[in-house]
Structures are given as C-alpha cells and as structure tokens.
C-alpha cells in the first residue's frame, strides 16, 4: 500500500468530495499509473493568495477503489493556464475522513519527513498533481 498527497484547488476539491473521483492531467499519467487499489490519498488544497487569501489545507483522506481509467468527461474545473484540461486519468475513491474544519497544512510542515527544506516547503509540491509520502507522514496527518 502506498500513500499519496494529491494537490488540488478549492473548486476541484468540491468535485472530489461530491463525486468521489480523483483525476490528473495527461502529463501526470505516469504518476497516477503507480496508484493501486487500496492506496490512500490525502487531499491537499493549495493556498490562495491576495485579498482572498486562504492557507493550504488538508481536506480529506480517501481509499482508492478502482484501477486507473481514462474518462474525458468534463467534471473538473480546468486551470486558467490550460482551459481545455479535463483531468482524464482517474481513480474512484471511498471516503475515509473529511476534515471539518480542514487541517492547516503549514502547522504540519515542521513534523513532516518528506518536506526536507522547511523554509522552501512549497518546492516539494510545486509542479505536481500528486506525490508519494511516507507512511509516517500519512499517520501524522490522519491522526491529527
């Protein structure tokens, strides 16, 4: 079993929560193809800057209940940079826990093993849709 931190925005978090589906862009096909039934996904919502500032949050934990499949139906909201993106590589999910209120990710940074550079922590997440994390970090986040 593997543990994954899945990076999304507020709009697509709502889709994940409602439809119980995680999807990634074509360019992340190789990453999602490593995901197996039974793996655990932690949903990380990116921070929002400016006047609508919101810190980064851990929103929920899900178990993967399907193999990776391709579906180009438009359920996720595309990013402004790629308005035609449909996040076609997907897995179906079973909810384990939704955090209400969400967990402030910045408070976890000092304790997380996978973040080796605590000052420039966002570099461990930038440019990724998802990344594998150690079981120890999964337990720290979920046990919070």
UniProtKB/Swiss-Prot annotation:
<dbReference type="InterPro" id="IPR015947">
    <property type="entry name" value="PUA-like_sf"/>
</dbReference>
<keyword id="KW-0614">Plasmid</keyword>
<comment type="similarity">
    <text>Belongs to the UPF0310 family.</text>
</comment>
<dbReference type="InterPro" id="IPR022996">
    <property type="entry name" value="UPF0310"/>
</dbReference>
<dbReference type="Pfam" id="PF01878">
    <property type="entry name" value="EVE"/>
</dbReference>
<dbReference type="InterPro" id="IPR002740">
    <property type="entry name" value="EVE_domain"/>
</dbReference>
<protein>
    <recommendedName>
        <fullName>UPF0310 protein MJECL36</fullName>
    </recommendedName>
</protein>
């Amino acid at each position: 079993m593997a543990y994954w931190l899945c990076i999304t925005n507020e709009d697509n978090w709502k889709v994940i929560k409602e439809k119980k589906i995680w999807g990634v862009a074509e360019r992340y096909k190789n990453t999602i193809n490593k995901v197996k039934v039974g793996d655990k996904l932690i949903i990380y919502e990116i921070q929002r800057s400016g006047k609508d500032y919101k810190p980064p949050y851990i929103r929920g934990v899900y178990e993967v209940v399907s193999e990776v499949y391709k579906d180009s139906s438009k359920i996720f909201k595309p990013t402004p940079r790629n308005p035609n993106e449909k996040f076609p590589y997907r897995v179906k999910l079973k909810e384990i826990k939704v955090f209400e209120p969400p967990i402030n990710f910045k408070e976890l940074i000092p304790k997380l093993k996978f973040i080796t550079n605590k000052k420039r922590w966002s570099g461990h997440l930038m440019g990724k849709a998802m990344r594998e994390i150690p079981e120890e970090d999964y337990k720290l986040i979920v046990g919070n």
